[in-house]
């Protein structure tokens, strides 16, 4: 009887040790991050507030490298084009936007979203904002939430 209790306790200890080891292994397993690569078209009707114009993003994402090509057109007006290169390790990149403004941007991961800290130099002013980019709706939609002192905007793009 005494030996059977020892055997039971030993089995329980071994089982708990294995459970603890597997939990630590899962917690230490590298988390996968979404791939933002693709061709994305702005969904004007679903944006908050609603937007106009034709905006297309061509994103190449090979983490930590992130390249975003933006094409903007408003009917018959001249279109705007810009290419920005970032890294997702928090290093600041300097680029020129489609509107000609200078941007100083750092990008980091927060869970499965990209967070952009943006400093825009426009007409002698410096504007600070933050954008959070997430892939939603089973990979069909890119959601950009822009936070500025004058409010928050949500810009949605669908995958083409």
What positions do the PLM features span?
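Bacterial N-terminal signal peptides that target proteins for export
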Residues: 3-18
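Hydrophobic small-molecule pocket/channel-lining residues, especially in calycin-type beta-barrels
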Residues: 29-160
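Basic/polar N-terminal segments that are highly enriched at the extreme N-terminus
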Residues: 2-5, 29-31
């Amino acid at each position: 009887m005494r030996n059977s209790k020892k055997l039971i306790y030993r089995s329980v200890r071994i089982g708990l040790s294995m459970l603890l080891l597997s939990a630590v292994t899962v917690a230490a397993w590298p988390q996968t991050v979404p791939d933002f690569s693709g061709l994305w078209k702005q969904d004007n009707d679903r944006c908050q507030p609603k937007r106009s114009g034709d905006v297309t993003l061509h994103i190449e994402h090979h983490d930590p490298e992130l390249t975003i090509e933006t094409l903007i057109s408003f009917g018959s007006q001249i279109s705007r084009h810009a290419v920005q290169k970032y890294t997702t390790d928090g290093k600041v990149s300097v680029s020129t936007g489609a509107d000609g403004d200078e941007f100083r941007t750092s990008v980091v991961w927060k869970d499965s979203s990209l967070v952009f800290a943006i400093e825009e130099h426009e007409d002698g002013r410096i504007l600070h904002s933050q954008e959070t980019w997430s892939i939603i709706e089973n990979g069909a939609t890119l959601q950009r939430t822009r936070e500025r002192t004058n409010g928050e905007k949500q810009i949605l793009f669908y995958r083409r």
